């Protein structure tokens, strides 16, 4: 059974420079850590939550270990300088799935996300495998049932697989099916897709679903496509699979990318999303601390989370 736990205060530690000036602060000094899951108390804040689950990665024959991602990313975030926007972060703990019940874990996350959004918060979720996206995305769809929701995925993989049960490779097919069941349009864009890592069947599925697809080779010149997608929806859910980055920047994932999209290009792509006023939910997924020997990959991932919170309007 999926359970909720508050984040350990030991994760939020860092260098104290406050003697220099009142605003010489780091995230560990400005993040609010909640001992209860109580989003109703934190309107207009950003709910930082962990989804400590990699059952979907295991089912997808990937490298397990992403369940340790949320706490590793908290540690990496803790010592980063606190700037505008970061004071809005409220750590609402981890959803932990100690059993293979992926479906139950996704439902728990879905309910939590919907509750946060309906309470007037926005959500920043640290995965976990990309199975995080179904629970997170479904919660967004639930919270904004009368509005068009755009799903923007930065990922080497389309994650539209067809299997007999949910995995880390199926979340966007699941979200498409959920939209079908709710008689609403499925607005999905995937940037950074590796043609070498997706079969023709997956490309055909993306075409049939009218997915906006931008390959890794073309992301250097994709801002117009991003802006066009932003303009056509009311609300946005942004999900970043860290395997969109090149292996030399992000080795600590289930399926490292031989080519990938460099971090600077990813940041340029997500900036207009964050500043659009439409972003309601974001996540970083697939970080696997077992393959991060010196913590450098955690800092790369944390920089993305740091930047999202800073730019979020």
Swiss-Prot record:
GO terms for biological process: L-histidine catabolic process to glutamate and formamide; L-histidine catabolic process to glutamate and formate; putrescine biosynthetic process from arginine, via agmatine. Its EC number is 3.5.3.8. It catalyses: N-formimidoyl-L-glutamate + H2O = formamide + L-glutamate. InterPro entries: HutG, Ureohydrolase, Ureohydrolase_dom_sf. Mn(2+) 1 binds at residues 130, 155, 159, 241. CDD domains: Formimidoylglutamase. Its cofactor is Mn(2+). Catalyzes the conversion of N-formimidoyl-L-glutamate to L-glutamate and formamide. This is Formimidoylglutamase. It comes from Salmonella newport (strain SL254). The gene is hutG.
């Amino acid at each position: 059974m999926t359970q909720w736990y508050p984040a350990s205060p030991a994760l939020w530690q860092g260098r104290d420079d406050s003697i220099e000036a009142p605003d010489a602060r780091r995230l560990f000094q400005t993040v609010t850590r909640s001992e209860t899951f109580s989003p109703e108390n934190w309107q207009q804040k950003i709910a930082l939550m962990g989804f400590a689950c990699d059952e979907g990665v295991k089912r997808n024959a990937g490298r397990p270990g992403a369940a340790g991602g949320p706490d590793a990313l908290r540690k990496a975030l803790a010592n980063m300088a606190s700037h505008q926007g970061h004071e809005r972060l409220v750590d609402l703990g981890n959803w932990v799935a100690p059993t293979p019940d992926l479906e139950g874990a996704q439902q728990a996350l879905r309910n939590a996300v919907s509750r946060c959004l309906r309470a007037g918060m926005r959500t920043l979720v640290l995965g976990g495998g990309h199975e995080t996206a179904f629970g997170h995305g479904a919660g967004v769809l639930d919270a904004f049932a009368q509005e068009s929701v755009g799903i923007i995925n930065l990922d080497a993989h389309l994650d539209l697989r067809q299997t007999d049960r949910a995995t880390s490779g199926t979340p966007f097919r699941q979200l498409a099916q959920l939209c079908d069941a709710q008689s609403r349009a499925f607005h999905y864009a995937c940037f950074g897709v590796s043609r070498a890592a997706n079969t023709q069947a997956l490309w055909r599925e993306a075409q049939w679903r009218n997915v906006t697809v931008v390959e890794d080779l073309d992301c250097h010149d994709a801002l117009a496509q991003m802006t066009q997608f932003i303009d056509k929806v009311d609300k946005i859910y942004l999900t970043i699979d860290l395997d969109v980055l090149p292996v030399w920047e992000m080795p600590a994932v289930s399926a490292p990318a031989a080519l990938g999209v460099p971090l600077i290009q990813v940041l340029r792509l997500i900036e207009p999303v964050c500043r659009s006023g439409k972003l309601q939910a974001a996540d970083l997924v697939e970080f696997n601390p077992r393959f991060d020997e010196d913590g450098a990959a955690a800092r790369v991932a944390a920089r993305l989370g740091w930047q999202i919170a800073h730019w979020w309007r």
